[in-house]
C-alpha cells in the first residue's frame, strides 16, 4: 500500500534499539487489557486498550484468525546408549510419529541411537529412534515408537511449551500461550496477536456485526529466525503448512462485495490469506506457504492488520512496513517505546486501519 524507496531493501533499515525492560516476560491479565496502539491513515497515533476494539471496527468488517494450536514441543530425555541428557524440540510431523526435530547435543545423536523420555529411563514413557540427520536445519529425524494416540497422550504429560528465547520465565499456565479459539494442533509458536482476545470480546464483536473467519497456519521455528542478508530481496522465507477453508473464502468474498474490510489478526493470517491468493484468485485448500512480504508487495486481500511489536531486522517488520511504510512503522515503534508499551510475544498490540476514523 506504500511505494518503496531504495533504502527499504537494506536490512539495517529495519533496526531499532529496544530497552530490555520493554520485552514482556508475562502476559497481561485479563487478556484484553493489553494496550493497543492504533495506526490510522495520516493522523496522530491513538492510544487505546484491546478491549476498545469493538469501537474501532465497524459492522461488516471481517477478522481473519489463525486457529492453530501450539504443541508442548519441548521434551527432555536421555540417550539410551550413554545416559547423556538430551533436549528435543519437535518442529514438524511428517507422518504418524515421524518428526523433524532440533536436538541438543546434536553431535552426539547419530542415526541409529535412541532417546528415552520420562522420569524413569529404565521404564520410559516415550522412546524415539534417530533415523537421519537433516542438513537443511541441522536437526534430526526421529521416529517415536508406539501408537499415535499414546504418543499424543504422553506428549501432553512430558512436553513443555516452547516459549521464544527472549522470554526467560516458564509458562505457569500453558493455556496462556494459546489463543482462546485455537483448535488445530501443530504450531511450535503461538500466533501472538490473537492472544489478546477473550470469549466475551469475540461475542461483543459478533453482536455488533463484526464477523470472524478461521485459517490455519502452523507457526514453525522460522518465525524466530532473523533475516541475515543485507539486501532483503535475497532473503529466502521459511515455509509453513497452512489451510484456508472454503467457508472462509466465501466470507471474504461476501465482505468485499458488501464494502467491508478484511482485517488479519496477526502476520500468520496475512501470509495464509495472501498466499492463498498468490495466483490472483483467492482459493481454498491446504498447501505450504513461503510468501515473503516486504515493501513493494502488491496486496491482494488484506485491508488492515492487528499485530504485536516485532523484533528488529525481522521479516515480520518488513511485512508490516509493506502495509504502512517503513519510516512510519519505525516512528510508531519509537512512540511505543517512549510510551512504555510492552514488546514481542506477550506484549501489547497495534491496530493498523488505513481508513480508520476516531470513534
Curated annotation (Swiss-Prot):
Catalytic activity line of the entry: 7-aminomethyl-7-carbaguanosine(34) in tRNA + S-adenosyl-L-methionine = epoxyqueuosine(34) in tRNA + adenine + L-methionine + 2 H(+)
Principal localisation: cytoplasm
Annotated localization: Cytoplasm
GO cellular component: cytoplasm
Gene Ontology terms: biological process: queuosine biosynthetic process; tRNA wobble guanine modification
UniProt keyword list: Cytoplasm, Queuosine biosynthesis, S-adenosyl-L-methionine, Transferase
GO terms of molecular function: S-adenosylmethionine:tRNA ribosyltransferase-isomerase activity
Pathway named in the protein's UniProt entry: tRNA modification; tRNA-queuosine biosynthesis
Enzyme Commission (EC) number: 2.4.99.17
UniProt keyword Transferase, yes or no: yes
Family annotation (PANTHER family): S-ADENOSYLMETHIONINE:TRNA RIBOSYLTRANSFERASE-ISOMERASE
Family: Belongs to the QueA family.
Functional description taken from the UniProt entry: Transfers and isomerizes the ribose moiety from AdoMet to the 7-aminomethyl group of 7-deazaguanine (preQ1-tRNA) to give epoxyqueuosine (oQ-tRNA).
Subunit annotation: Monomer.
Protein name: S-adenosylmethionine:tRNA ribosyltransferase-isomerase
Organism of derivation: Synechococcus elongatus (strain ATCC 33912 / PCC 7942 / FACHB-805)
Source organism phylogeny: Bacteria, Bacillati, Cyanobacteriota, Cyanophyceae, Synechococcales
Amino acid at each position: 500500500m506504500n511505494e518503496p524507496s531504495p533504502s527499504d531493501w537494506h536490512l539495517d533499515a529495519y533496526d531499532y534499539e529496544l530497552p530490555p525492560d520493554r520485552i514482556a516476560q508475562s502476559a497481561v491479565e485479563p487478556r484484553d487489557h493489553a494496550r493497543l496502539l492504533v495506526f490510522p491513515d495520516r493522523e496522530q497515533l491513538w492510544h487505546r486498550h484491546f478491549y476498545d476494539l469493538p469501537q474501532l471496527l465497524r459492522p461488516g468488517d471481517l477478522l481473519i484468525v489463525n486457529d492453530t494450536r501450539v504443541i508442548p514441543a519441548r521434551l527432555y530425555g536421555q540417550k539410551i546408549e550413554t545416559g547423556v541428557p538430551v533436549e528435543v524440540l519437535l518442529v514438524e510431523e511428517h507422518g504418524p510419529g515421524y518428526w523433524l526435530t532440533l536436538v541438543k547435543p546434536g553431535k552426539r545423536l547419530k542415526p541409529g541411537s535412541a532417546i528415552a523420555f520420562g522420569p524413569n529411563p529404565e521404564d520410559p514413557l516415550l522412546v524415539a529412534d534417530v533415523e537421519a540427520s537433516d542438513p537443511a536445519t541441522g536437526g534430526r529425524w526421529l521416529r517415536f515408537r508406539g501408537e499415535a494416540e499414546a504418543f499424543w497422550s504422553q506428549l501432553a504429560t512430558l512436553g513443555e511449551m516452547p516459549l521464544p528465547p527472549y522470554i526467560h520465565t516458564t509458562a505457569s499456565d500453558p493455556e496462556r500461550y494459546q489463543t482462546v479459539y485455537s483448535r488445530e494442533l501443530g504450531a511450535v509458536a503461538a500466533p501472538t496477536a490473537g492472544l489478546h482476545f477473550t470469549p466475551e470480546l469475540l461475542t461483543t464483536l459478533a453482536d455488533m456485526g463484526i464477523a470472524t473467519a478461521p485459517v490455519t497456519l502452523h507457526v514453525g521455528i522460522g518465525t524466530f529466525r532473523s533475516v541475515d542478508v543485507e539486501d532483503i530481496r535475497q532473503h529466502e522465507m521459511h515455509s509453513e503448512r497452512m489451510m484456508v477453508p472454503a467457508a472462509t473464502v466465501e466470507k471474504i468474498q461476501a465482505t468485499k462485495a458488501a464494502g467491508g474490510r478484511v482485517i488479519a489478526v496477526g502476520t500468520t493470517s496475512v501470509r495464509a490469506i495472501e498466499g492463498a491468493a498468490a495466483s490472483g484468485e483467492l482459493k481454498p485448500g491446504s498447501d505450504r506457504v513461503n510468501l515473503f512480504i516486504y515493501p513493494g508487495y502488491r496486496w491482494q486481500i488484506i485491508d488492515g492488520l492487528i499485530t504485536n511489536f516485532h523484533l528488529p531486522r525481522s521479516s515480520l517488520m518488513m511485512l508490516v512496513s509493506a502495509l504502512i511504510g517503513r519510516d512510519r512503522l519505525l516512528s510508531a515503534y519509537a512512540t511505543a517505546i517512549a510510551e512504555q508499551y510492552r514488546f514481542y510475544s506477550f506484549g501489547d498490540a497495534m491496530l493498523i486501519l488505513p481508513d480508520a476514523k476516531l470513534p
